[in-house]
């Protein structure tokens, strides 16, 4: 079950100071006496802290995330509706939900908040940070966190299906999805009541996202031009599939949260304010397993190849599957084999 801790204050990059900031989290395993065996799992856009649910194939004895050896931690990202500070949580200064007034978080704000949370849990250093998509963005930002003596706070990195910065291609996808939400009359500039949210807009945004998360061979191979029964109202099977996923998200997510998180993703750029992009990547010295997907059209393999080219201690592995971007949430056995083998060969030296 998810637990919650409170960070007393947090000042964001834009100067906003928040107080009594909740952070939801789950853990598996036991933190060692030196506080150095933590493995941080960073979740994706609409994910939550329940790693056992969406990455169960990687979690367990003998697997990539081994609670008999690791203190596995997943922290909910601010902006998400699953327990951390977000548009759906109460602003202690007003006694009302943040709603449309939720301040903009950057990926760096998230990492700074999560570091405070980890330190509250007694973590002194993280042995490995692993995550895909939005989670991979946070993994790369963790590379720049240092201890008081200047050593890396996170000793090894596993960014999956992500690049070192959000490109115009990815920003454009998010912008179009947000516009679908804004076009819903129930959006009301984000001030909608909790019992009457812009469900059509959010469902449409999810439908658009699902297309980008798959690949043409995946959708063509699964659905082709198959038709649905007339009474369904959607002529083609792929339409029914997209409507299904749109409606599922509406039942478990919030439109303001979706807007906040996609905007946070757009801030992702490891070189912002740090200098030349290639030089910044070359400064990341931690052992890194970069995982790409050969059918990913949203974060194409060329972006992981670029990361691996510049990260001085990187290993590149490729998941070959037709599913597209979401392969890292589908081909769990293959991903587990890659991560567990790499950790056994490389990361044992950093888990002291």
Swiss-Prot record:
A GO cellular component entry from the record: cytoplasm
Gene Ontology BP terms: homoserine metabolic process; methionine biosynthetic process
Annotated active site residues, numbered on this chain, are 133, 296, 325
Compartmental location: Cytoplasm
Q: Where does substrate bind?
A: 206, 326
Q: Which residues form the AB hydrolase-1 domain?
A: 37-330
According to its UniProt record, the EC number is 2.3.1.31
Q: Please state the pathway this protein functions in, per its UniProt record.
A: Amino-acid biosynthesis; L-methionine biosynthesis via de novo pathway; O-acetyl-L-homoserine from L-homoserine: step 1/1
* Name of the molecule in the record: Homoserine O-acetyltransferase
